[in-house]
């Protein structure tokens, strides 16, 4: 019925909205981590001075400028970047999963419809993403520089 179809559309829009919001907050938290280390270490190099974008740029900044090498070594880095990639599929591809990304979705049990490769996430998936992001950031904020860096 049209009511069922409407409910399905609202549900997927809600899950997509939560995914987009979570990844935006993740990226802002990582950027904040970089700013904190810049200020605490009295560093002259800023995050914007490092090539790249998003999580990879922040990881490069933390490693090369701050001296934290463990950020990308975290046990859930691959899962976190897969969540980010799902967000990118929603934003840039209408929620359609590209064929080369399907193995990652399969590895982490992230659903998509076989017939049209549409990303299919439920509330339980969103909660798993949320918990993984919180755990990752908790560990990230505990990392300390292992090398001395000069401002």
Where are these regions (language model features)?
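Flexible secondary-structure boundary motifs
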Residues: 20, 28-115, 120
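Aromatic-acidic/polar surface patches that form glycan- and anion
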Residues: 11, 15-19, 122, 126-129
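Charged alpha-helical initiation segments
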Residues: 1-15
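Charged, amphipathic alpha-helical oligomerization/scaffolding segments
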Residues: 21, 25, 82-85, 89, ...
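Amphipathic, Lys/Arg-enriched alpha-helical patches that create a basic surface
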Residues: 103-151
């Amino acid at each position: 019925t049209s009511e069922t179809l409407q409910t399905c559309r609202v549900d997927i829009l809600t899950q997509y909205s939560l995914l987009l919001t979570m990844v935006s907050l993740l990226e802002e938290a990582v950027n904040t981590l970089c700013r904190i280390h810049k200020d605490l270490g009295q560093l002259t190099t800023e995050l914007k001075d490092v090539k790249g974008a998003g999580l990879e740029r922040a990881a490069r900044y933390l490693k090369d400028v701050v001296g934290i090498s463990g950020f990308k070594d975290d046990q859930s880095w691959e899962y976190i970047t897969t969540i980010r990639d799902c967000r990118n599929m929603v934003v840039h591809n209408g929620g359609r999963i590209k064929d080369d990304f399907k193995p990652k979705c399969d590895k982490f049990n992230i659903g998509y419809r076989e017939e049209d490769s549409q990303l299919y996430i439920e509330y339980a998936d969103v909660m798993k993403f949320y918990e993984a992001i919180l755990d990752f950031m908790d560990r990230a904020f505990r990392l300390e520089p292992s090398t001395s860096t000069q401002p």
